[in-house]
C-alpha cells in the first residue's frame, strides 16, 4: 500500500512511519508547516512546526530511507484552526484546537491532498487503535490515549487513517525509537497549544482581540466582585486569576459559571453551580438510532461518566447519569462503549 506518513518531528510519528515501512508499505514522509511566525524559525523555539521539528522529521526519514517533503498548510491552519479558536473564545466558548486540527487539517486538507496524489492512507503517530472495519478504540496506554481528539472524525476519514502505535505504550515507543537509533527517542512531548508556545492563552487572545473590559458578577448576590480586561481570557470552571476586588458574601471560593461576550460579563459562583447533567452537541458524528447507553468524556484527559445519548434532528443530546463539573460550550463530547468510540460532537449548550 502507498501511504503518506505525517511526521511532526516527534518520537511518535517517527516510530509510526518506521512501523509502516516494516509492514511493507511504500511510505513517503511529510512534515506540515503550519506557522509563518518568525518565532518558529528561531533555533530552540517551542511550539508549532518549528525549524527544529522539520529537521528532526527529515533526519528520521533519512534513517528510515523514505522520501520526505514539507507541505505548507499555514494559510489553511490559520483559517480553519486559529481563526476558529479566536472566534470561539470571543463568543464565550472554549474550543479544543487539537480536535479541530484533526478534523480539518490532518484528516481533511492532508488526507484530501494525499488521496489526490495517489496515496491510499495517511499514517500518524496518534495513540489510538483502529479495527479493520474502521472502529476507533482507545490506546492500550490509558495515559497517552488520544481517541478523544479523534472522536469526531467521520467514517470516511477513519477509513483512510492508520494508527500503528495503538497497541503500544509510550515507554515502548521510546525504547523502540532508541533501538532504531532515531534521535528523537528522548525528545519531550509537546503539552502546550501548539501555536501558543509561551502558554499564555489570555495574553495571546488579548493581542488578537484587544481590550474588552467588563464586570465580574456574583451569580448568588448579583454584586460586582471585580473587573477584567476581556471575557475571552476566561473559561467556564476557572478559579484562579479571576481578578476579584472583594470576596464573595459567603466567603467561599468562586468559579466562572458563564461568559457573556455581548456585555463582556463574567459570572462567577460556587463550585456546585458548575454541575452539568445535560449536553447538546452539534457537528455530531452519530450513526446510531434511539437512546444509547454509553460513557461520556468531555475533556482530553478527563474521566468518563455514564450517559444516555440520542440524536435529535441535527443535534446530539447527551444526558449524564452522573453530573460533570465545569463543562463548557465549544468542547468536544466523545461517547464510548468500553474502549470503543461510538461517536461525538461539539458541545453547543449545557444544562444543570
Curated annotation (Swiss-Prot):
Keyword NADP: no
Gene Ontology terms for molecular function: ATP binding; tRNA binding; tRNA-uridine 2-sulfurtransferase activity
SUPFAM superfamilies for this protein: Adenine nucleotide alpha hydrolases-like (SSF52402)
Domain of life: Bacteria
Record site feature (Interaction with tRNA), residues: 126, 331
Disulfide-linked positions: 101-194
Keywords (A to Z) from UniProt: ATP-binding, Cytoplasm, Disulfide bond, Nucleotide-binding, RNA-binding, Transferase, tRNA processing, tRNA-binding
Biological processes, Gene Ontology terms: tRNA wobble position uridine thiolation
Keyword flag RNA-binding: yes
This enzyme's EC code(s): 2.8.1.13
Segments of this protein annotated with the region Interaction with tRNA: 144-146
Gene3D superfamilies: Adenine nucleotide alpha hydrolases-like domains, HUPs, Translation factors
Catalytic activity: S-sulfanyl-L-cysteinyl-[protein] + uridine(34) in tRNA + AH2 + ATP = 2-thiouridine(34) in tRNA + L-cysteinyl-[protein] + A + AMP + diphosphate + H(+)
Pfam family, one: tRNA_Me_trans_M
InterPro entries noted in UniProt: MnmA-like, MnmA-like_C, MnmA-like_central, MnmA-like_central_sf, Rossmann-like_a/b/a_fold
Chain positions recorded as ATP binding sites: 6-13, 32, 125
A GO term from the CC aspect: cytoplasm
Compartments, as annotated in UniProt: Cytoplasm
Enzyme class: transferase
Catalytic site positions: 101, 194
Function recorded in the entry: Catalyzes the 2-thiolation of uridine at the wobble position (U34) of tRNA, leading to the formation of s(2)U34.
PANTHER family: MITOCHONDRIAL TRNA-SPECIFIC 2-THIOURIDYLASE 1 (PTHR11933:SF5), TRNA 5-METHYLAMINOMETHYL-2-THIOURIDYLATE -METHYLTRANSFERASE (PTHR11933)
UniProt family annotation: Belongs to the MnmA/TRMU family.
Listed name of the protein: tRNA-specific 2-thiouridylase MnmA
Origin species: Frankia casuarinae (strain DSM 45818 / CECT 9043 / HFP020203 / CcI3)
Name of encoding gene: mnmA
Amino acid at each position: 500500500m502507498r501511504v503518506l506518513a505525517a511526521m511532526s518531528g516527534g518520537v511518535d510519528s517517527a516510530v509510526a512511519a518506521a512501523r509502516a515501512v516494516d509492514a511493507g508499505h511504500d511510505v513517503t514522509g511529510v512534515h506540515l508547516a503550519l506557522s509563518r511566525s518568525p518565532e518558529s524559525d528561531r533555533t530552540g523555539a517551542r511550539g508549532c512546526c518549528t525549524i527544529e521539528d522539520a529537521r528532526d522529521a527529515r533526519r528520521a526519514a533519512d534513517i528510515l530511507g523514505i522520501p520526505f517533503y514539507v507541505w505548507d498548510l499555514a494559510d489553511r491552519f490559520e483559517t480553519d484552526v486559529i481563526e476558529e479558536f479566536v472566534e470561539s473564545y470571543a463568543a464565550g466558548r472554549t474550543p479544543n484546537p487539537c480536535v479541530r486540527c484533526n478534523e480539518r487539517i490532518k484528516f481533511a486538507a492532508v488526507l484530501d491532498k494525499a488521496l489526490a496524489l495517489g496515496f491510499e492512507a495517511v499514517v500518524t503517530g496518534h495513540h489510538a487503535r483502529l479495527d479493520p472495519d474502521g472502529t476507533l478504540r482507545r490506546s492500550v496506554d490509558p495515559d497517552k490515549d488520544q481517541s478523544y481528539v479523534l472522536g469526531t472524525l467521520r467514517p470516511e476519514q477513519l477509513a483512510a487513517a492508520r494508527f500503528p502505535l495503538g497497541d503500544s505504550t509510550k515507554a515502548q515507543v521510546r525504547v523502540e525509537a532508541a533501538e532504531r537509533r532515531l534521535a528523537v527517542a528522548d525528545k519531550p512531548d509537546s503539552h502546550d497549544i501548539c501555536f501558543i508556545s509561551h502558554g499564555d492563552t489570555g495574553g495571546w487572545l488579548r493581542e488578537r482581540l484587544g481590550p474588552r473590559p467588563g464586570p465580574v458578577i456574583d451569580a448568588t448576590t448579583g454584586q460586582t466582585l471585580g473587573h477584567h480586561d476581556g471575557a475571552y481570557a476566561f473559561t467556564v470552571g476557572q478559579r484562579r486569576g479571576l481578578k476579584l476586588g472583594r470576596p464573595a458574601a459567603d466567603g467561599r471560593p468562586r468559579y466562572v459559571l458563564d461568559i457573556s461576550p455581548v456585555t463582556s460579563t463574567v459570572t462567577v459562583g460556587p463550585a456546585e453551580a458548575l454541575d452539568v447533567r445535560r449536553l447538546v452537541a452539534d457537528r455530531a458524528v452519530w450513526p446510531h438510532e434511539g437512546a444509547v447507553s454509553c460513557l461520556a468524556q468531555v475533556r482530553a484527559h478527563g474521566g468518563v461518566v455514564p450517559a444516555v445519548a440520542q440524536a435529535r434532528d441535527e443535534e446530539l443530546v447527551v444526558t449524564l447519569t452522573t453530573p460533570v463539573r465545569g463543562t463548557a460550550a465549544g468542547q468536544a463530547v466523545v461517547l464510548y462503549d468500553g474502549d470503543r468510540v461510538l461517536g461525538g460532537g461539539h458541545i453547543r449548550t449545557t444544562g444543570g
